[in-house]
Design a protein with these regions (language model features):
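DG-centered beta-turn motif at the end of beta-strands
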Residues: 34-37, 58, 77, 129, ...
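C-terminal "exit" segments of structured domains
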Residues: 200-253
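Loop/turn elements at helix/coil->beta-strand transitions in domains of secreted/extracellular proteins
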Residues: 27-29, 71-75, 135-141, 166-173, ...
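Second-shell loop/turn segments in exported
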Residues: 19-20, 43-55, 64-65, 94-98, ...
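VWA/integrin I-like adhesion module and closely mimicked acidic/polar interface patches used
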Residues: 113-114, 148-195, 202-204, 208-212
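Acidic, polar low-complexity linker/tail segments
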Residues: 1-48, 97-101, 127
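Short beta-strand-loop
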Residues: 42-44, 72-110, 131-136, 153-156, ...
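An active-site-proximal "capping" alpha-helix that borders the catalytic cofactor pocket
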Residues: 52-72, 77
Length: 253
């Protein structure tokens, strides 16, 4: 795993976001797709326990990186997993915060309540995520943070290829937070990025996770990267896609 991971120079993307970059004319829409499955309670180095639990590190990093994203960029949050094992565990994905403006505080607040549990319905989550962009002009850009492959016997790469065949352009940058994941899992995550025209990053520390998110955002909004990103008119969603309503989490006990 990780042979094709994008190499990052620590801190460069975050600095560029803060100091200013040449922006695209076309609007950018960014959806953070966050893995909340059971294994996200493990440490970033693959061992159990503290100090850098994968989901906790992701939530902490998001607090900082969201502040660096320009206020006119639309951002949203969808999660998958985050449920006790049951018959419908392979359909557990929720749009917690729809893609929009002036919602950074809401994203941070709702992310803070998340706990790692359940399976990894990655393919189903990507299908639902694609529908989240319906009606939005501009580019579709997903930042997927995950520690492994789909555990619901689905292949997300098949779905991404299908979208491409249908002419539905959606870039997925993938941040893998388990450096010790099995080869098959690493291949699946890298495949999602490759097939969508995105990039794959490895992040085994909180610092690397932050750099990867900043780099992905930079790619989404900078004019320099425009030729590599997917173009964005308002397109009707393919018939295969259906959207779920925003989900309200019940208070944690």
């Amino acid at each position: 795993m990780g042979t094709n991971a994008t190499k990052l120079e620590t801190g460069t993307a975050g600095t560029l976001l803060q100091t200013g970059i040449e922006r695209k004319i076309e609007p950018s829409n960014i959806l953070i797709l966050l893995d909340c499955s059971n294994t996200m309670q493990l440490a970033l180095d693959g061992s159990t326990g503290v100090p850098e639990e994968r989901l906790a590190a992701a939530k902490n990093v998001l607090k900082g990186t969201l502040r660096t994203i320009p206020s006119d960029v639309k951002v949203g949050l969808r999660i998958f997993g985050n449920s006790n094992l049951r018959d419908d565990s392979c359909k557990q994905t929720f749009l917690l915060v729809p893609i929009g403006l002036h919602n950074r505080g809401e994203i941070v607040a709702k992310a803070e309540r998340l706990k790692p549990r359940g399976l990894t319905p990655l393919a189903y989550a990507l299908k639902e995520a694609a529908a989240d962009f319906e009606g939005l002009p501009g580019e579709r850009h997903i930042i997927l943070i995950s520690d492994g492959a789909d555990t619901c016997h689905q292949d997300p790469c098949v779905f991404i290829r299908k979208l491409r065949e249908l002419g539905f352009k959606m870039r997925v940058d993938v941040i893998g937070v388990d450096k010790k994941a099995k080869i098959a899992e690493g291949w699946q995550l890298e495949c999602i990025a490759k097939e969508s025209g995105g990039k794959y990053f490895e992040a085994d520390t909180a610092a690397k996770l932050g750099d990867a998110i900043n780099q992905s955002v930079l790619e989404a909004i900078s004019q320099k990267a425009a030729d590599h990103n997917v173009s964005g008119q308002v397109m009707p969603r393919p018939a295969e896609l259906r959207a779920s309503p925003p989900h309200k989490l019940e208070k944690s006990k």
